[in-house]
Design a protein with these regions (language model features):
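Short acidic/Ser/Thr-enriched loop-to-helix initiation segments
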Residues: 1-28, 94-137, 143-160, 231-236
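Structural motif
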Residues: 5-8, 38-40, 60-64, 109-112, ...
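Extreme N-terminal leader/targeting regions
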Residues: 6-57
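Short glycine/serine/threonine/alanine-rich loop segments
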Residues: 27-34, 55, 81, 132, ...
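Short beta->alpha junction loops
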Residues: 33-42, 140, 166-174
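Well-ordered alpha-helical segments embedded in enzymatic catalytic cores
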Residues: 42-46, 119-122, 179
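Gly/Ser-rich helix-loop-strand patches that form or flank binding pockets
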Residues: 45-99, 183-236
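Glycine/small-residue-rich hydrophobic helix-like segments
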Residues: 149-199
Length: 236
């Protein structure tokens, strides 16, 4: 199986980091130019092409520009595999420099939405192959759904004897994603893992989805996992 690197902007550090993580995860590295997306005509065609090629994960190197990022977000909304954004604002970070492993610390915000628990699987894979510590940033809600989701993720990872801790956020589920960039200095992650929006609401259409905000303001790579209705039962 393969990890695919789509390059809209080319930075050697992006490529080096993506290749190291691919090697660490025991996958084959494959690289294409972003123009390949236009050859598939639509999102469904792109998804089918990835399936035919046996791609398990995508890296996307792109300029830190909201229209460019949104174009890739739109293209990836139907994907059933994780995808990682690497923007030019991340290219000088120590995490992208030469080091033994690509990941030491992974930050994953957790909201009240049930699909958050699906991140457990990819967090487990990343931690198992890289040895990275997982930090769950639990939304500060009045209800207990975010706490319940964070607890289920922690239990899943703990059963595999993987390092995980829960940190309480300052904001609730509606705003915790926008807290993520400001917490990168004190929590020092090497990657952020987010659940993409189910559907875009009016605020998302006017101001952009929360995941785009994180990507535009992040100083480390950002991985997105699309919510999948057929997997919501995992959260019951």
């Amino acid at each position: 199986m393969k990890f695919l690197h789509i390059e809209d902007s080319t930075y050697d550090l992006h490529r080096q980091w993506a290749m190291r993580l691919t090697e660490r995860m025991g996958k084959e590295y494959m690289r294409i130019d972003a123009d390949m997306l236009t050859a598939t005509a639509d999102a469904d065609g792109f998804s089918q092409w990835l399936q035919d090629e046996g791609v398990d994960l995508i890296f996307i190197s792109a300029e830190c520009n909201k229209r460019i990022i949104q174009r890739f977000l739109n293209a990836c909304r139907s994907l059933r595999i994780p995808y990682v954004f690497l923007t030019d604002s991340m290219r000088k970070m120590p995490v992208l420099a030469e080091q033994e492993t690509a990941l030491h610390q992974i930050l994953a915000p957790v909201t009240m939405l049930e699909e958050e628990v699906y991140k457990s699987e990819i967090l487990g894979h990343l931690s198992r192959y890289t040895g990275a510590q997982i930090t769950l940033l639990q939304a500060k809600d009045y209800g207990q759904r975010a706490q319940h989701n964070a607890g289920k993720i922690r239990t899943f990872l703990a059963h595999q004897e993987l390092p995980v801790e829960i940190v309480m956020a300052k904001k609730d589920s509606l705003s915790v994603y926008k807290e993520v960039p400001s917490r990168m200095r004190d929590l020092t992650p090497d990657m952020v893992v987010l659940t993409a929006s189910r559907e875009y609401g009016l605020d998302d259409l006017f101001f952009g989805p929360a995941e785009r905000y994180v990507i535009l303001h992040s100083i480390v790579p950002v991985m997105l996992v699309n919510p999948r209705g057929d997997l919501f039962s995992l959260c019951d």
